[in-house]
Amino acid sequence: MDFELNEEQRMFRDSLRKFLDAEVRPLDDRWGDLEMTAERAKPLLKMLIPWGYADSEGILAGGSDPIIGCVQSEELSATFPGLSGMSGITSGAASLIAASAHPDLARRLVAPLSHADLIGCIATTEPEAGSDPSGIRSRAERKGDHWVINGAKTWISNGSVADIAVVLAQTDPAKGPLGFRHFVIDRRESPFDSREIQTIGLRSFPTSQMFFNDVEVPETNVLGGWSSERVSPERAFQRTLSLFSHARAGTGMMAVGIARRAYEIALKYVQIRKQFGKEIIRHQLVAAMVAEMATEIDAARLLCNRAYLALRRGRADVEASMAKWYATEAAVKVASTAIQCMGANGLATENRVERCLRDARMLTMPDGTTQIQKLIIGRALTGKSAIR
């Protein structure tokens, strides 16, 4: 396996990086640590469309080349991580709808989501069902030719700004996880309430509570079962688990980008800052910290690349969990080390690196905590579950 980018991939990366540095980085400086609105987000997302973001390929963008998808995610996350998250979630919703929705619904929604005319979200987590998705309590009841949905979701990315929500709900509690179905809720036609959750980091990547009170959707808004090529409705829970694997790989790659941003800021600083008559990079302990940061980033990137490649071949639960666990924890470690390299200056908000730490810390929780990832890996390696 060649661990270096090929010529086409390098050219894409270099062109994308040039565009992001010139056009998007100033926007991150202005809005990256502020609450995002739909009105502000849509023009920003539209800027990314020529580069393959927010398309119906979903989290693993990049067409036939998953490494291009890795490059896209890392570069945008290193530049404007909040926008990277919003783009990934919207494209994930578009991907689900494109693959499993009624053809009429797919024709109506996929293009607007892909063109950033609409923002999407995927609503799974609930107040009593975080790391354990089998505990979903939101109910969907059939009434004639439509469904009525009641329940609450929490910690939903894009939830407060989403026009389109893909919501997991229970249709038959007696069936357990086999009763789960995904429903597409168009907020313009079936309104629901939401509330922004204030967080320490990724403030421009909305995180929300969502409330569904007698929300009606037509039968055609149920995902799955519309042709022999589409996922059976009975497989909704397996689809949910597969979604988690894709999201974990994407979250891992976001972490790589954030870690790289912190590293680059610190690397520049230690080559300029002088103490005891020389640049601080020439002090052994500082040089060691720089080496550790670079190694952590490379290791995390390789794990994420492997997960992206594996997901293109099918289910890759272990690879995705390894990537998510290692990359997010590495990002926290790298950002903290970057602050240490810069001393008191690392604590100043004007130097940006402290936000890298706050942003990185946000990523160890979603899509299953670090501890849940380790349990998933352990179960796969031994065949024995430490969860149940």
Residue ranges and their predicted role:
Residues S84-D104, G130:
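N-terminal glycine-rich flavin-associated loop
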Residues R25-E35, L267, Q271-K278, A294-Y326, ...:
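C-terminal helix-coil-helix/basic helical segment that borders enzyme active sites and/or dimer interfaces
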Residues F3-L5, D193-D298, L363, R388:
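Glycine-rich beta->alpha junctions and the first turn(s) of the following alpha-helix
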